[in-house]
Amino acid sequence: MQFGELVKTLAAVESTTQRTTMVKLLTSLFKKARPEEIDKIIYFVLGDLRPPWEGVELGVAEKLCLRAVSKATGVSISELEALYKKTGDVGEAARKALSTAKRPGLLAFGQQKPLEVSEVYDTLLKVAQASGEGAQDMKISLLASLFAKASPEEAKYIARFVVGKLRLGVADMTLIEALSDAFGVDKEALERAYHIYPDLGKLARHVAEGRPLEEIKITPGVPVLPMLAQRLSSSSEILAKLGGSAICEYKYDGERAQIHLKEGVVKIFSRRLEDITHAYPDVVKAVREAVSAREAILEGEIVAIDPDTGDMLPFQELMHRKRKHEVAVAVEMYPVVLNLFDLLYIDGEDLTNEPLIYRRVRLSEVVQETEKVSIAKWRVFDDAEEIDVFFHEAVSLGMEGLVCKSPTSVYEMGARGWNWIKYKRDYKSEMIDTVDLVVVGAFYGRGKRAGLYGAFLLAAYDPATDMFYTVCKVGSGFTDADLKKMYEMLQPYKIPHRHPRVVSKMEPDVWFTPQVVIEVIGAEITLSPLHTCCLGAVKPGVGLAIRFPRFTGRYRTDKSPEQATTVSEMIELYKRQKKVAQPE
């Protein structure tokens, strides 16, 4: 496929505000693609070269990209920087530079065969792989060769891609729907395969080649989509939901981790499927010592502890582990422990379809607890009062609460169902719990907030429609440093119109691709005609909103937008709140 064909589709996707139109455009694109290039097309649409856990990064900042454009066009760096400053878009700067190049003889566009998708992808992969002495010059030369062959519109999307600002915001579920339509594959079967092996490029090539999805198996080294939990704040309701019996375990305030062991090699993946092994060399060593298996996939929570007292510390302390050049120091200053709670695979045996109680037994058989690795504390209950006692014990020890699970439940990858239920209480607020919401818009600040965003439009996610519905406008709880950080975090996702996956009655000053997730709390959840979350579910014409919302200070960088609080969770919180508020 010619790269120009892909670019036409990207431009059309970027300009639409309708998700159905987006799906049709992508379906048409996939039908035209050859099997050997469809994986590359998928990666390009997603803004990545490889799946997230492979950690392939281009390592190209705006200045380096502009140097490559300058080399290809003869337009000076100062002129390009002025264009970039004026447009705020490195892609637009590249497009305009190629449209008005001072030395068009440098450009090969129109003088040879058009760029192919595979040529662009393979060149960008070489850019990502360039390392060591002279790597920067190599990256510039490779990119310049692409810009020299590209049309102005092609250059726009190449530039955006290499600096990580493609701005399309196409969700994995949208791509799955388009692949299903393009190749006549059952959508639910494709979703199941994606949950097991969440590499859409590989799956797209698999179906394009006409191979059966049954060949896709759980594989050590490839993270599966994590199973997620609903939430309730009553032990009796939890027991009723779980059929009268529950496995209750401590809910630790840490980082959820999927641990893969294969032939002595340990990999650690985040809930966003990113490889975070580099941050936890001590956990890698501890897993090798504690787990007796050749191959295994386990789940647990990595928790920071006080090196002097051994007491558990808040999740935020783990942020010290994220600075790659300071990990060795952080290991000493911010030690961690791993609390395991599930076993998904062991030596060729897929356990995800086995009941939880069986998986727990197998977990205890393969894990030898040590100072650094333990099995999360758990018990089986059939009495609500006993659950409450266990809950208060957990909270008194610094836990967030409990996670209560059906003993007979299988591991539902990627699902947020009622087989796992969080039992949490926030005693500092009238709201039962905090919520994790996605920033979809912003309002310009005034006074001392001038030049930044003063408030943000937040939304909850609906997995049934793959859309985001607004819940509140929040401006409280942000320090000056927070507002500056939010501005910087959101700039790469700024778009000229409402995103096709966002449903909103409010019109903010700025729209964003749904990407950034933050934690919010408020006084209560109320009915509101201004917001679209659960619109019409409680009362015709009105949705749910958070009254007096406040940012807690916690950036949920560990969560993807699709892992944010769902609309069903919002309505459950609203119902629970009403039950508490109304005397019996």
From Swiss-Prot:
Residues that, per the record, bind ATP: 249, 256, 271, 301, 341, 416, 422
Enzyme class (EC, first level): ligase
Biological process according to GO: cell division; DNA biosynthetic process; DNA recombination; DNA repair; lagging strand elongation
Gene3D superfamilies: DNA ligase, ATP-dependent, N-terminal domain, DNA ligase/mRNA capping enzyme, Nucleic acid-binding proteins
Keyword Repeat found: no
UniProt cofactor(s): Mg(2+)
GO MF term list: ATP binding; DNA binding; DNA ligase (ATP) activity; metal ion binding
Listed EC numbers: 6.5.1.1
Keywords per UniProt: ATP-binding, Cell cycle, Cell division, DNA damage, DNA recombination, DNA repair, DNA replication, Ligase, Magnesium, Metal-binding, Nucleotide-binding
Signal peptide positions (record): none
Active site: 251
Catalysed transformations (reactions): ATP + (deoxyribonucleotide)n-3'-hydroxyl + 5'-phospho-(deoxyribonucleotide)m = (deoxyribonucleotide)n+m + AMP + diphosphate
PROSITE patterns, alphabetized: DNA_LIGASE_A1, DNA_LIGASE_A3
UniProt cross-references to SUPFAM superfamilies, sorted A to Z: ATP-dependent DNA ligase DNA-binding domain (SSF117018), DNA ligase/mRNA capping enzyme, catalytic domain (SSF56091), Nucleic acid-binding proteins (SSF50249)
One Pfam family here: DNA_ligase_A_M
Record family assignment: Belongs to the ATP-dependent DNA ligase family.
Free-text function comment from the UniProt entry: DNA ligase that seals nicks in double-stranded DNA during DNA replication, DNA recombination and DNA repair.
Protein name (database record): DNA ligase
Organism: Pyrobaculum islandicum (strain DSM 4184 / JCM 9189 / GEO3)
